[in-house]
């Protein structure tokens, strides 16, 4: 039961705060907390050829708190010596969410801004060859907005989980902070910070020039008609239910013969399914955070 799992998590935390070490293994997203990323050890096992023999090789990935603090202070020199473990946890405390925590157990992650993408992408993926997410261990993680995407990317990436970032660039937005965040995400992925002129798709990141809805509208000729049907069937007002409308449209499109997946989303999904882990994204100096065990 979810309530029991949350209770167990609190009990474990209380025991640990009393000075005893608690070690447990889990596949439950309710028993991990992104704010305590440094206490999570991610185990990965693969079959590899070692000395000519097929061997099970296990790796244990962990992200030390010191590396995250060093990274933050390197990026913001004015914080040098001021970042404590408690304040670092505060930066991530809002992110505790079983759906987001699911990323710790994924083989690959697609980081998205909100529910529109979380609801719709899996539906479109099901209509593409070899792209269904669940059988491949791929999770779509909504970040609660563009502002938190870089933080979650750093955690998941440093645990060696391949991540694909999808966001709205919001070109034309008068809020400089929003545009700066878009540029920051592109830089984080090693891409140019120049404003894209159209849909931008790379090996580990993609962004719509303005927004999901407006950019895809040209690829869905009857988008307005479908949106109207969704509002009528779901009882939504004109300015509400954006994620539900997007999901409705996705379902209607793939029910057609043949299924209709907007070309932009087809390209993005195929890139996301193929994403591979590249390198650390931290500015901090790397240290020992991985152990190899051959069995």
Report residues per predicted region.
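Switch/communication elements of ASCE P-loop NTPase nucleotide-binding domains
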Residues: 1-86, 90-98, 274, 278, ...
């Amino acid at each position: 039961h979810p309530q029991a799992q949350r209770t167990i998590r609190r009990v474990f935390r209380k025991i640990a705060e009393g000075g005893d070490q608690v070690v447990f293994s889990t596949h439950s997203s309710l028993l991990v907390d992104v704010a305590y990323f440094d206490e999570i050890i991610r185990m990965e096992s693969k079959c590899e050829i070692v000395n000519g023999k097929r061997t099970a090789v296990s790796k244990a990935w962990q992200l030390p708190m010191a590396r995250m603090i060093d990274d933050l202070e390197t990026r913001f020199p004015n914080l040098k010596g001021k970042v404590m473990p408690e304040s670092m946890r505060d930066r991530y405390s809002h992110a505790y969410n079983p759906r987001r925590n699911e990323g710790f157990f994924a083989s690959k992650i697609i980081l998205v801004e909100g529910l529109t993408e979380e609801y719709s992408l899996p539906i479109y993926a099901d209509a593409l060859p070899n792209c269904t997410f669940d059988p491949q261990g791929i999770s779509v993680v909504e970040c609660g907005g563009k502002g938190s995407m870089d933080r979650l990317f750093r955690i998941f990436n440093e645990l060696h989980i391949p991540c694909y970032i999808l966001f709205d660039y919001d070109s034309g937005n008068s809020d400089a902070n929003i545009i700066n965040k878009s540029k920051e995400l592109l830089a984080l992925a090693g891409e140019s910070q120049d404003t894209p002129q159209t849909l931008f798709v790379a090996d580990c990141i993609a962004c719509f020039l303005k927004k999901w809805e407006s950019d895809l509208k040209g690829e869905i000729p009857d988008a307005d008609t479908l949106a109207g049907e969704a509002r009528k069937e779901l009882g939504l007002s004109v300015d509400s239910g954006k994620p539900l409308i997007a999901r409705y449209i996705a379902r209607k499109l793939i029910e057609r013969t043949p299924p209709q997946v907007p070309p932009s989303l087809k390209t993005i999904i195929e890139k996301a399914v193929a994403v591979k882990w590249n390198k650390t994204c931290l500015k901090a100096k790397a240290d020992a955070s991985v152990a190899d065990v051959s069995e």
